[in-house]
Protein backbone atom coordinates (compact mmCIF):
# COMPACT_ATOMS: atom_id res chain seq x y z
CA UNK A 1 0.00 0.00 0.00
CA UNK A 2 1.47 3.34 -1.04
CA UNK A 3 1.97 6.12 1.48
CA UNK A 4 -0.65 8.82 1.89
CA UNK A 5 0.50 12.28 0.87
CA UNK A 6 -0.06 15.65 2.53
CA UNK A 7 0.84 18.60 0.29
CA UNK A 8 1.31 22.06 1.76
CA UNK A 9 1.36 24.97 -0.67
CA UNK A 10 3.36 27.96 0.55
CA UNK A 11 6.35 28.50 2.82
CA UNK A 12 5.01 31.45 4.79
CA UNK A 13 3.96 31.29 8.44
CA UNK A 14 0.74 29.35 7.80
CA UNK A 15 2.31 26.87 5.39
CA UNK A 16 5.43 26.29 7.46
CA UNK A 17 3.49 25.72 10.67
CA UNK A 18 1.05 23.42 8.86
CA UNK A 19 3.84 21.24 7.49
CA UNK A 20 5.81 21.11 10.74
CA UNK A 21 2.63 20.59 12.77
CA UNK A 22 1.54 17.71 10.54
CA UNK A 23 4.96 16.07 10.81
CA UNK A 24 4.94 16.41 14.59
CA UNK A 25 1.44 14.96 14.95
CA UNK A 26 2.27 12.04 12.65
CA UNK A 27 5.34 11.33 14.77
CA UNK A 28 3.24 11.41 17.95
CA UNK A 29 0.82 8.93 16.37
CA UNK A 30 3.66 6.66 15.30
CA UNK A 31 3.08 7.11 11.57
CA UNK A 32 6.37 7.19 9.68
CA UNK A 33 7.05 8.37 6.12
CA UNK A 34 6.23 4.90 4.81
CA UNK A 35 2.63 5.58 5.90
CA UNK A 36 2.25 9.35 5.35
CA UNK A 37 4.57 11.72 3.51
CA UNK A 38 4.48 15.49 4.03
CA UNK A 39 5.78 17.84 1.35
CA UNK A 40 5.88 21.63 1.20
CA UNK A 41 5.91 23.48 -2.12
CA UNK A 42 7.46 26.95 -2.21
CA UNK A 43 8.79 29.13 -5.00
CA UNK A 44 12.24 29.34 -3.40
CA UNK A 45 14.30 27.77 -0.63
CA UNK A 46 13.49 30.34 2.05
CA UNK A 47 10.87 31.31 4.58
CA UNK A 48 10.60 35.09 4.48
CA UNK A 49 9.54 36.75 7.74
CA UNK A 50 7.50 39.15 5.65
CA UNK A 51 6.25 41.29 8.52
CA UNK A 52 9.88 42.39 9.13
CA UNK A 53 10.76 43.32 5.53
CA UNK A 54 10.68 47.00 6.45
CA UNK A 55 13.72 46.65 8.75
CA UNK A 56 17.13 48.06 7.88
CA UNK A 57 18.93 44.75 8.41
CA UNK A 58 17.27 42.04 6.32
CA UNK A 59 19.66 39.27 7.37
CA UNK A 60 17.35 37.74 10.02
CA UNK A 61 14.19 37.86 7.89
CA UNK A 62 15.20 35.07 5.48
CA UNK A 63 15.30 31.57 6.97
CA UNK A 64 16.41 28.51 4.94
CA UNK A 65 13.41 26.18 4.80
CA UNK A 66 15.59 23.08 4.85
CA UNK A 67 16.88 24.07 8.30
CA UNK A 68 13.31 23.75 9.61
CA UNK A 69 11.80 21.07 7.40
CA UNK A 70 14.72 18.66 7.15
CA UNK A 71 14.94 17.69 10.84
CA UNK A 72 11.22 16.79 10.96
CA UNK A 73 11.22 14.84 7.71
CA UNK A 74 9.22 17.21 5.50
CA UNK A 75 10.17 17.18 1.82
CA UNK A 76 10.69 20.57 0.16
CA UNK A 77 9.66 21.04 -3.46
CA UNK A 78 10.96 24.22 -5.09
CA UNK A 79 8.63 25.54 -7.74
CA UNK A 80 5.67 27.71 -8.66
CA UNK A 81 2.16 26.32 -8.25
CA UNK A 82 0.61 26.46 -11.72
CA UNK A 83 -2.72 24.75 -11.11
CA UNK A 84 -4.82 22.57 -8.82
CA UNK A 85 -7.04 19.71 -9.97
CA UNK A 86 -9.53 19.52 -7.11
CA UNK A 87 -11.45 16.60 -8.59
CA UNK A 88 -8.33 14.59 -9.39
CA UNK A 89 -6.55 15.69 -6.19
CA UNK A 90 -3.32 16.80 -7.84
CA UNK A 91 -1.22 19.96 -8.00
CA UNK A 92 0.72 21.09 -11.07
CA UNK A 93 4.05 22.71 -10.21
CA UNK A 94 6.52 24.48 -12.48
CA UNK A 95 10.00 23.43 -11.35
CA UNK A 96 13.50 23.71 -12.79
CA UNK A 97 12.85 20.32 -14.41
CA UNK A 98 9.61 21.43 -16.06
CA UNK A 99 5.98 20.77 -15.16
CA UNK A 100 5.41 18.19 -12.42
CA UNK A 101 2.08 16.80 -11.25
CA UNK A 102 1.99 15.93 -7.55
CA UNK A 103 -0.96 13.92 -6.18
CA UNK A 104 -2.32 14.53 -2.70
CA UNK A 105 -4.63 12.93 -0.18
CA UNK A 106 -4.84 16.12 1.87
CA UNK A 107 -3.99 19.61 0.64
CA UNK A 108 -3.18 22.72 2.69
CA UNK A 109 -3.59 25.86 0.58
CA UNK A 110 -1.43 28.56 2.22
CA UNK A 111 -0.05 30.66 -0.63
CA UNK A 112 -0.62 33.90 1.25
CA UNK A 113 -1.35 37.34 -0.12
CA UNK A 114 0.41 39.79 -2.35
CA UNK A 115 0.60 43.54 -2.67
CA UNK A 116 -2.38 45.08 -4.41
CA UNK A 117 -1.07 47.06 -7.37
CA UNK A 118 -3.82 49.16 -8.94
CA UNK A 119 -3.59 50.53 -12.45
CA UNK A 120 -1.66 53.67 -11.48
CA UNK A 121 0.63 54.87 -14.29
CA UNK A 122 4.27 54.38 -13.29
CA UNK A 123 3.53 52.23 -10.23
CA UNK A 124 5.03 49.03 -11.62
CA UNK A 125 8.06 50.78 -13.09
CA UNK A 126 9.01 53.32 -10.43
CA UNK A 127 7.57 52.40 -7.00
CA UNK A 128 9.31 50.27 -4.38
CA UNK A 129 7.70 47.84 -1.93
CA UNK A 130 8.43 45.72 1.14
CA UNK A 131 6.05 42.94 0.10
CA UNK A 132 8.84 40.46 -0.63
CA UNK A 133 12.42 39.97 0.48
CA UNK A 134 13.70 40.92 -2.97
CA UNK A 135 11.53 44.02 -3.01
CA UNK A 136 12.79 45.07 0.41
CA UNK A 137 16.42 44.43 -0.60
CA UNK A 138 15.93 46.55 -3.73
CA UNK A 139 14.54 49.40 -1.62
CA UNK A 140 17.44 49.21 0.85
CA UNK A 141 19.96 49.26 -1.99
CA UNK A 142 18.23 52.28 -3.52
CA UNK A 143 18.26 54.21 -0.23
CA UNK A 144 21.93 53.43 0.37
CA UNK A 145 22.74 54.87 -3.04
CA UNK A 146 20.89 58.17 -2.57
CA UNK A 147 23.89 60.15 -1.19
CA UNK A 148 25.88 59.33 -4.32
CA UNK A 149 23.28 60.78 -6.65
CA UNK A 150 23.41 64.40 -7.87
CA UNK A 151 21.32 66.93 -5.99
CA UNK A 152 17.74 67.20 -7.25
CA UNK A 153 14.31 68.18 -5.88
CA UNK A 154 12.97 65.37 -3.72
CA UNK A 155 16.23 63.42 -3.68
CA UNK A 156 15.96 62.88 0.07
CA UNK A 157 12.17 62.67 0.21
CA UNK A 158 10.59 59.27 0.80
CA UNK A 159 6.84 58.87 0.32
CA UNK A 160 5.17 55.78 1.77
CA UNK A 161 1.74 55.21 0.24
CA UNK A 162 -0.67 53.35 2.48
CA UNK A 163 -1.21 54.14 6.17
CA UNK A 164 -2.15 50.66 7.30
CA UNK A 165 0.08 48.62 9.60
CA UNK A 166 2.71 47.84 6.95
CA UNK A 167 2.86 51.43 5.72
CA UNK A 168 3.14 52.82 9.24
CA UNK A 169 5.94 50.39 10.11
CA UNK A 170 7.76 51.16 6.87
CA UNK A 171 7.41 54.92 7.31
CA UNK A 172 8.62 54.91 10.92
CA UNK A 173 11.71 52.94 9.89
CA UNK A 174 12.69 55.43 7.17
CA UNK A 175 14.09 58.30 9.31
CA UNK A 176 16.53 55.91 10.97
CA UNK A 177 17.56 54.40 7.63
CA UNK A 178 18.15 57.81 6.07
CA UNK A 179 20.04 59.14 9.07
CA UNK A 180 22.37 56.12 9.05
CA UNK A 181 23.00 56.32 5.31
CA UNK A 182 23.63 60.06 5.34
CA UNK A 183 25.90 59.88 8.39
CA UNK A 184 27.96 57.17 6.72
CA UNK A 185 28.29 59.39 3.65
CA UNK A 186 29.10 62.44 5.85
CA UNK A 187 26.21 64.24 4.20
CA UNK A 188 23.86 65.38 6.94
CA UNK A 189 21.34 67.03 4.64
CA UNK A 190 17.72 67.51 5.80
CA UNK A 191 15.33 64.82 4.58
CA UNK A 192 11.56 64.29 4.51
CA UNK A 193 9.40 61.24 5.09
CA UNK A 194 5.76 61.48 4.03
CA UNK A 195 3.01 58.96 4.82
CA UNK A 196 0.14 59.25 2.33
CA UNK A 197 -3.25 57.54 2.29
CA UNK A 198 -6.63 58.02 0.63
CA UNK A 199 -8.37 57.64 4.00
CA UNK A 200 -8.94 60.61 6.27
CA UNK A 201 -6.87 59.14 9.10
CA UNK A 202 -3.93 56.83 9.70
CA UNK A 203 -4.39 53.23 10.79
CA UNK A 204 -8.03 53.15 9.74
CA UNK A 205 -8.20 49.35 10.20
CA UNK A 206 -6.79 49.50 13.72
CA UNK A 207 -9.65 51.39 15.33
CA UNK A 208 -10.11 54.75 16.98
CA UNK A 209 -8.16 53.98 20.22
CA UNK A 210 -4.95 53.32 18.27
CA UNK A 211 -5.01 56.58 16.35
CA UNK A 212 -3.58 58.97 18.99
CA UNK A 213 -0.70 56.57 19.69
CA UNK A 214 0.13 56.26 15.99
CA UNK A 215 -0.11 60.00 15.41
CA UNK A 216 2.15 60.71 18.40
CA UNK A 217 4.78 58.28 17.07
CA UNK A 218 4.68 59.87 13.62
CA UNK A 219 5.00 63.35 15.11
CA UNK A 220 7.96 62.32 17.28
CA UNK A 221 9.77 61.07 14.17
CA UNK A 222 8.81 64.20 12.21
CA UNK A 223 6.95 62.16 9.62
CA UNK A 224 4.51 64.22 7.58
CA UNK A 225 1.08 62.86 6.71
CA UNK A 226 -0.91 63.49 3.55
CA UNK A 227 -4.36 62.07 4.16
CA UNK A 228 -7.36 62.04 1.86
CA UNK A 229 -4.84 61.81 -0.97
CA UNK A 230 -5.26 59.93 -4.24
CA UNK A 231 -2.25 59.15 -6.43
CA UNK A 232 -2.65 59.83 -10.16
CA UNK A 233 0.78 58.70 -11.35
CA UNK A 234 4.33 57.89 -10.23
CA UNK A 235 7.56 58.82 -11.99
CA UNK A 236 11.28 58.51 -11.17
CA UNK A 237 11.16 62.04 -9.77
CA UNK A 238 8.05 61.74 -7.61
CA UNK A 239 4.30 61.42 -7.82
CA UNK A 240 1.34 63.41 -9.09
CA UNK A 241 -1.84 63.64 -7.05
CA UNK A 242 -5.32 63.60 -8.56
CA UNK A 243 -5.55 67.26 -7.57
CA UNK A 244 -2.71 67.95 -10.00
CA UNK A 245 -0.17 68.66 -7.27
CA UNK A 246 3.34 67.39 -7.92
CA UNK A 247 5.23 65.85 -4.99
CA UNK A 248 8.97 65.58 -5.74
CA UNK A 249 10.36 62.34 -4.29
CA UNK A 250 13.12 60.04 -5.46
CA UNK A 251 11.59 57.21 -3.45
CA UNK A 252 7.94 56.11 -3.44
CA UNK A 253 7.16 52.98 -1.41
CA UNK A 254 3.80 51.35 -2.17
CA UNK A 255 2.13 49.70 0.84
CA UNK A 256 -1.52 50.27 -0.09
CA UNK A 257 -3.31 47.01 0.51
CA UNK A 258 -2.98 43.30 -0.15
CA UNK A 259 -5.08 40.62 -1.82
CA UNK A 260 -5.10 36.84 -1.45
CA UNK A 261 -3.12 34.79 -3.94
CA UNK A 262 -5.03 34.75 -7.25
CA UNK A 263 -5.12 30.92 -7.27
CA UNK A 264 -8.04 31.20 -4.85
CA UNK A 265 -10.11 31.61 -8.02
CA UNK A 266 -9.67 27.87 -8.66
CA UNK A 267 -11.97 27.02 -5.76
CA UNK A 268 -15.74 26.78 -6.41
CA UNK A 269 -16.56 29.08 -3.50
CA UNK A 270 -17.39 32.75 -3.13
CA UNK A 271 -14.36 34.73 -1.97
CA UNK A 272 -14.60 37.96 0.02
CA UNK A 273 -13.45 41.36 -1.25
CA UNK A 274 -9.85 40.52 -0.35
CA UNK A 275 -9.98 37.30 -2.37
CA UNK A 276 -10.05 35.08 0.73
CA UNK A 277 -11.94 31.79 0.60
CA UNK A 278 -14.35 30.61 3.33
CA UNK A 279 -13.34 27.86 5.75
CA UNK A 280 -15.02 26.14 8.68
CA UNK A 281 -13.78 25.95 12.27
CA UNK A 282 -11.28 23.26 11.27
CA UNK A 283 -9.88 25.37 8.39
CA UNK A 284 -11.51 23.09 5.81
CA UNK A 285 -12.48 24.83 2.57
CA UNK A 286 -16.24 24.82 2.43
CA UNK A 287 -17.62 22.35 -0.09
CA UNK A 288 -14.20 21.07 -1.24
CA UNK A 289 -13.13 17.62 -0.07
CA UNK A 290 -9.74 17.08 1.57
CA UNK A 291 -8.59 20.69 1.21
CA UNK A 292 -7.68 23.08 4.02
CA UNK A 293 -6.78 26.76 3.73
CA UNK A 294 -4.83 28.90 6.19
CA UNK A 295 -3.23 32.30 6.52
CA UNK A 296 -3.99 35.24 4.26
CA UNK A 297 -5.95 33.13 1.75
CA UNK A 298 -8.63 32.10 4.27
Predicted segments with their positions:
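Short glycine-enriched, charge-decorated loop/helix-capping segments at active-site entrances
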Residues: 52-57, 124-128, 210, 268-270
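Predominantly flavin-linked oxidoreductase catalytic cores and closely associated redox partners
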Residues: 125-221, 225-227
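Beta1-alpha1 glycine-rich phosphate/pyrophosphate-binding loop at the start
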Residues: 2-78, 168-205, 253
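Short hydrophobic core segments
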Residues: 9, 102-114, 231, 239, ...
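FAD-site-proximal beta/loop scaffold in flavoenzymes
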Residues: 125-150, 239-240, 246-298
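A conserved beta-strand/loop element that lines the FAD pocket in flavoprotein oxidoreductases
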Residues: 72-85, 219-234
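FAD-binding core/adjacent interface of flavoenzyme oxidoreductases
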Residues: 2-3, 74-159, 186, 253
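Short glycine-rich anion-binding loops that position phosphate/pyrophosphate groups of nucleotides
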Residues: 14, 112-115, 171, 258-260
Amino acid sequence: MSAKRILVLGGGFAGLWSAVGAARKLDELGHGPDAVKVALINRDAFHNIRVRNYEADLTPVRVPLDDVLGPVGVQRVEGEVAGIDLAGQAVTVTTARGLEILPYDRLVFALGSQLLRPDVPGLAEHAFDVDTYNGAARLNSHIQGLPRRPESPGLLTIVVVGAGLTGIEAATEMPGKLHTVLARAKRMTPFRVILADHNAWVGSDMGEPARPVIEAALTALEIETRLGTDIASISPSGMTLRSGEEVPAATVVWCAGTRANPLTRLFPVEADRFGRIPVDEFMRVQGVANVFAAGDVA
